């Protein structure tokens, strides 16, 4: 067997660049997760999955590593505190978690608990999120910021929540909202805590660049800010404004765009302070990105800066502008949800099968027994036997021409089905032989660089792309994917990953590779009776809540895990994935009614002796078991 090391696997999957020192490969060749960056403690993911299956927790399984979540919260706050100290910044930093990034109750509760020492807050953007935020903050005084569109009921709820002791700030997104706020504040006699969202001319970069700029969906233009100040003065509520908010989009890939936005926001803050608006907080919104592909570039799946650089620029730019303007520096708020939760969850699942030709007939034997192969088949066979490095280009082009010719002749009725099957088999053999030669040639001829797509095998995995990783399908987001095991062995298959939905879009064909974006995922040949698992990493932000019920595949099993020095890990919580009856209920089917309808029909079939009692009973038993079972595939 060809020598291969775990270091070579780490390089192939670019692990060291996207893993943020939270993932590594152990001596067994299994990928591990660490509770914090550079920690020596680790959990072997393959061993963990084996243990979970023994506990009857079936894949796909969403693994939530709560120590990683805690570490990310601590890390972001630490780098900001360091930046404050280095720049002698006279105010404080505070992080607010936008719960839209991952609204799962257990996740938000954990963030609230871990973040208490940092005075973490919650950002909400709708009435349901407001109610969730109030529930989480009850008893612990967590501050809440309300963004998004608001109606009278929303505003009144916030006002009375403020009246009974909750620390909630309403951010004004539009002037008509401010009119409602002023009206309800006067009606209830409750003075609100207010923020104003400004529409910066600065834009971000990447997929969400339109969140900033003059055409942004939210925020007040400069003329509208002046109008808002006048409205608040006339209502005697100007002193209620204590926050200025801006946001140029999620996953900002370029640090220079962030700097430009910070300067503009700080200038607006300074001018508003000079106008007598006693703003205490400058909320710079989200945008702190995640390096999904490890390229450290301005590509939309990466960022060209570190968290440390981001924090230093935030503190420096704001302090510089405020000192220049002669105004007090504000307390700084950021809403860095993606950077907080992306790393803490991993989806693991099993590979079910591949589209390899292992089950194909022995065409070599068939060819030997054929008296006179079809001319097209004969030409392909001759190429296969004679190909070498000196005839690669010509043979490759001839092969493409001949396989197209075989299809045309078949459609015209001049080739049999067996002839076409043999032609396809020979085409595959020729491409593999070319590949074995090309791998030894440097540089690879340009016209041969993309031919490897013909070698790409499809690995079918037990998951729904639309449910678990919707951004991969919707916006072509890259997420790191790699096997959990056999990483001490050379991967010998170039693969794509297909899910189990009945949709051709349910396939991943772009991957994080050694040299950037790749059309292949290196995988190992499947062994008989071996369970082969893959992991989807950095999926903690947005994926769970954006997932849909395509083909009625529901939520996966989820497990909350913490590290334990004695036992390696502890399972804190197991959240069962959706059963079939639950996903059917979403679309207005009821399990008991289904069973009754089918049973009534079966009884009629039994009565006329078309179906036996035993067959009827067994079918109902199977149907009932399916309704109660996991929506994903078993053995």
Swiss-Prot record:
Q: Which UniProt keywords apply?
A: Decarboxylase, Lyase, Magnesium, Metal-binding, Polyamine biosynthesis, Pyridoxal phosphate, Spermidine biosynthesis
Which GO biological process annotations does it have? arginine catabolic process; putrescine biosynthetic process from arginine; spermidine biosynthetic process
Reaction(s) catalysed by this chain's protein: L-arginine + H(+) = agmatine + CO2
Instruction: Give the EC number(s) listed in the UniProt record.
Output: 4.1.1.19
- Pathway membership: Amine and polyamine biosynthesis; agmatine biosynthesis; agmatine from L-arginine: step 1/1
Source domain of life: Bacteria
A GO term, aspect molecular function = arginine decarboxylase activity
Needed cofactors, names only, are: Mg(2+); pyridoxal 5'-phosphate
Q: Which enzyme class?
A: lyase
N6-(pyridoxal phosphate)lysine occurs at 100
CDD domains referenced in this protein's UniProt entry, alphabetically: PLPDE_III_ADC (cd06830)
Q: Which residues bind substrate?
A: 282-292
Regarding protein family, the annotation reads:
Belongs to the Orn/Lys/Arg decarboxylase class-II family. SpeA subfamily.
Record's function text: Catalyzes the biosynthesis of agmatine from arginine.
* Listed name of the protein: Biosynthetic arginine decarboxylase
Species annotation:
Trichlorobacter lovleyi (strain ATCC BAA-1151 / DSM 17278 / SZ)
Gene designation per UniProt: speA
